[in-house]
Amino acid sequence: MHEIEKTKRKRNKDILKMSKKIAIIGAGMMGSALAYPAFENGNEVRLVGTPLDRDIIDGCIKNNQHLKFDIPFPQGVKYYQFEDWKTAVEGVDFVIGGVSSFGVDWFLTEVLAHIDPSVSVLSVTKGLINLEDGTLISYPD
C-alpha cells in the first residue's frame, strides 16, 4: 500500500472517530443548508423544524428534499417536527440554532432554556431585531 493511501485511510478513520451528533433547530434556508456539510463531514444530523417549518419537514420526510432546494439532502439526515424536538436533541454533542433574528427570543425560551447545559450551542442567526421603539439593530449589538 502506498504511503499516500495509508495517510488517507488514517485520516478517514480519524474523521469517523470525531463524528458528532448534531441537532439543527430551524429548517429554513440557513439551518437546512448547514445540514449538508455537517453530514458530509461524517456527523449524524438531525434537522428539526420550528412551528413555521411544518411543510418543509413534511417535504423532507416525503422526498428527502427541502421545498426550495434543487438537490436532495444526503441520505441519512433525520427529520423531526418541532413537537419532537426533545427526542431529536437526546444524546447530541451540540445544537445549532438556525432561526432568523426574529426567532431568537423564541429559540431562547422554547428550546435553549430546556437543553442540558453541558450541550454546546451554536447560533447561526442572521438579520435584524426590531426594538419596541421601532429601531432595527443587528445581532449581536
Where in this protein do the model-derived segments appear?
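Short, Lys/Arg-enriched N-terminal segments with co-localized hydrophobic residues
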Residues: 6-17
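A structured beta-alpha segment of the ubiquitous adenosine-cofactor-binding alpha/beta core
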Residues: 74-90
